[in-house]
Amino acid sequence: MTRHLLIAGVAVAALSLAACGQQTETKGAATPAEQAATPDANPAATVITPSNEAAAPDFVAKAAASDMFEVEAAKLAQTKAKNPGVKKFADEMVTAHTKSTADLKKAIADSGQTLALPTALPKDLQDKLSDLGKAENFDKAYMDNQVDAHQAALDVLQRYAQDGDVPVIKAFAAATAPVVQQHLDMARKIRDAVK
């Protein structure tokens, strides 16, 4: 009897550890930084939406921070970039991400939600912006950064468009994702051309 209880206990412990490992893998695979590390993967098709990303407050914070980062990085590129294609891309990003933020604010208002946009970049994005400003080959660093940032933004938008909890904000995510996909495609093309 004791032996059966011991075996059952070991089995439960083993299953619990296996389940913990699976949660860690799923959660880890859903982070934008790790998704950006696999540029040719299609994470939206294979990654389960973390429960907090289906909630409007988390999505709004991430989407707004992404837009804020894109605008600030583009302003930096407008002054530091040497390649005309990189400068043109930066100009387009200021316009597009300013519009995206305005559209997000409208979606929030239309939804009746009381959600506030962040007023400052999160530390990780502020650090990326600071590092970008110090890059020796700015054009290449900016375009590498843009590919990563747009992939991360696209992943968040696609997941919220699929699993989001507020229909009007979900519609914003669905409408914005194709625009971000276009930016990602442009960024990859320019990145590949920049030496």
Question: Can you say where each PLM-predicted feature lies in the sequence?
Answer:
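His/Met- and acidic-residue-enriched segments that coordinate or traffic transition-metal cofactors
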Residues: 2-10, 14-195
